[in-house]
Structures are given as structure tokens and as C-alpha cells.
Amino acid sequence: MNKTILFLLKRRNRLSTAIALILSICSFGIVNNWQYARAVEVAQSNNTQNTPAAVTNLLAQIDAAASKGDAKAVLQYYSPSFVHSDGLTRQTMEKALVTFWKRHPNVRYSTQVQSWKSEGNAIVAETVTNISASPSASNGNLALNSTIRSRQRIVGGAITRQDIVSERTVLTSGNKPPQVDVKLPQQVKVGQQYNFDAIVEEPLGDDLLLGAALEEPIQASRYLNPTSVDLQLLNSGGLFKIGRAPATPGSRWISAVIMRGNGMTVVTQRLQVVKR
């Protein structure tokens, strides 16, 4: 048992990189969520079957550019006055993208339009982007899967504003990373108490678990700066926490880190804090 604990503790140094990758998820999810090449003169619509071919074609082009790690090709579709709900700018987004792609050279993007409508000379679209990356030596053999739902405002063929609606990211490593079921509300009111559970689904046998829960405000500066975490020995099959939303509205990253002798899983979800 002591050898198992020592082995788990030696792997802590990987966690700073893992959490840093998670905290940059939004920025690279932004890359290809939705792009629009020209003004579309149509009535308001929520039927994705009516999405203009120019939109779907451009979406495929942006997915391809992001999958190749071509930041310049991606950023040409963002307005110089681009505004993001997390405080990102074109410059900070480019830095986060380049950093992420160095760590995950084999990343793949796939985006689907969920709904869209016209608002005067603008198009507002809601999309879902799936991001995946297989383990490689450059990322410490971490596998990544992320799903990001976002809303874009497009004017004159460029994105002028983007808001992240929801996100979930899973990082895994090792031969047998724990299967973790996370239970977290998507939205709470300021000051409201909430439950955050990360339950290991499979039997552990004689394995020991180390784990930790993280709650962090979402800020542009955190996209580039790694976050360290101290793991504790878990006496039960997961993490069971009670949190309280801050007194001011905003978004938080809530993460669960679970490690066993032959694998690690990190799950991060976005929690929206709204006014009462």
C-alpha cells in the first residue's frame, strides 16, 4: 500500500500541465464554433436544415484550419473589436491557441450549428464544438475530449462577440483512468449553495484513490497560467463537495481530479452564476 501511495504522489507533477490544458479549453473551443462569410438575407430561423451552404462550408474550413493548428487562418474571421464573455481578446486567444496546439499537435475539431437567427445586419448562432486529441509525448500522454456550446454574433463576415453557454472537458492518462460521473448544476444564483459530486463508477478493488476539487473564476489570465493542485487520499469512491456561489455573477471552472495507481481523470465543467 505504501508503494502505491508513493507512486501516486510521484505523478502529481503532471497535474499542473493537465489543469493548465483544461483552463485553456474555452480559448481553443472558440476557434471554430461558428463562422459566417457574408450577410444572409433571410427571415429568423431556428431550423438548422435551413442553414445557408455558405455557413456550413465556412464552418468546415475553420474546423480544418483549427485542426491543422493554423492560428492566423482562424483569427482572420474575428473582428478587430472582438469581445468575449471571458475577457479574451484576439491577442490572448492567439497565444492560448498556439500554446495548446504545441501540446496537442494532433487535435481535431468538429462543429455543428444548433440554431441561428437574423438580428438586423447581424447573425446570432448557437453551436456545439467537439474537440479531441489522442495521447502524445508532447502532452504527457494525455487524451482530451471536450464539448463546448457557445453563442456567436457575426457582423459583416466576422465574429464580433462570443459567449460560452456550457462546456465539459475530460482529460485522461494511464492504462486504466477512472470512469468518473460528475454531477454539477449548469447554473446557480449568487450566494446559492450547490452540490458537486465526482463519483468513480467502476469497482476499485485494492486500488487507492487520490483526488481534489477545484473552483476557479474564469478570467482571461487563467487561460495561459497553469494551476497546481494538492491531492488528498480519498476514503470513499469519489469526491462529494458542497459549494457556495460567489456574491457576484460570473462563470466558474469546477474541476474534479481523480487518480488511481494506473490512471488519472480530470473533469472540468463550467458553472454559470447569475443574479437572483
What does each of the following model-derived ranges do?
Residues 187-189, 193-240:
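Contiguous segments within soluble domain cores/interaction surfaces
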Residues 198, 242-262:
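Short, aromatic- and glycine-rich surface loops/edge beta-strands on solvent-exposed regions
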Residues 133-135, 259-268:
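Short acidic/polar inter-strand loop motif in beta-rich domains
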Residues 32-64, 68:
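Short, low-complexity N-terminal intrinsically disordered segments enriched in polar/charged residues
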Residues 67-92:
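Short, well-ordered alpha-helical segments enriched in acidic and aromatic residues
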Residues 140-178:
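Short beta-strand edge/turn micro-motifs at domain boundaries
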Residues 98-142:
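Surface-exposed, charged secondary-structure patches
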Residues 167-195:
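N-terminal edge beta-strand
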